From Swiss-Prot:
DNA-binding region residue numbers: 17-21
Name used for this protein in its record: Histone H4
InterPro entries: CENP-T/H4_C (IPR035425), Histone-fold (IPR009072), Histone_H4 (IPR001951), Histone_H4_CS (IPR019809)
Location of N-acetylserine modifications: S2
Disulfide bonds: none
Positions of the UniProt region annotated as Disordered: 1-20
Subcellular location per the Swiss-Prot or TrEMBL entry: Nucleus; Chromosome
Residues where N6-acetyllysine is found: K6, K9, K13, K17, K21
UniProt-listed GO biological process terms: nucleosome assembly
Family: Belongs to the histone H4 family.
Organism in which the protein naturally occurs: Solanum lycopersicum (Tomato)
Length: 103
């Protein structure tokens, strides 16, 4: 284990990922019933048909912002794994304090 640092057996060094699936159009995985359930939890009774695509768009932007900030915290700490605390700090930075995940 000489000169390999924390990795042990040289894990994650060299070589491209062979079977990396291209991620696109995953926002459609947020289904109509899932959006409906979220709206019900928020006290909504009837939902317009145009709401679903709009909700997907807003959710995508929100998640992009949170993930970008979380990854920034991770990179600053020189880690490769995003922790729950990175997400908590990212949400706090955006004015959405989240309790119950440490810190």
């Amino acid at each position: 284990m000489s000169g390999r640092g924390k990795g042990g057996k040289g894990l994650g060094k060299g070589g491209a990922k062979r079977h990396r699936k291209v991620l696109r159009d995953n926002i459609q995985g947020i289904t109509k019933p899932a959006i409906r359930r979220l709206a019900r939890r928020g006290g909504v009774k009837r939902i317009s048909g145009l709401i679903y695509e709009e909700t997907r768009g807003v959710l995508k932007i929100f998640l992009e912002n949170v993930i970008r900030d979380s990854v920034t915290y991770t990179e600053h700490a020189r880690r490769k794994t995003v922790t729950a605390m990175d997400v908590v700090y990212a949400l706090k930075r955006q004015g959405r304090t989240l309790y119950g995940f440490g810190g």
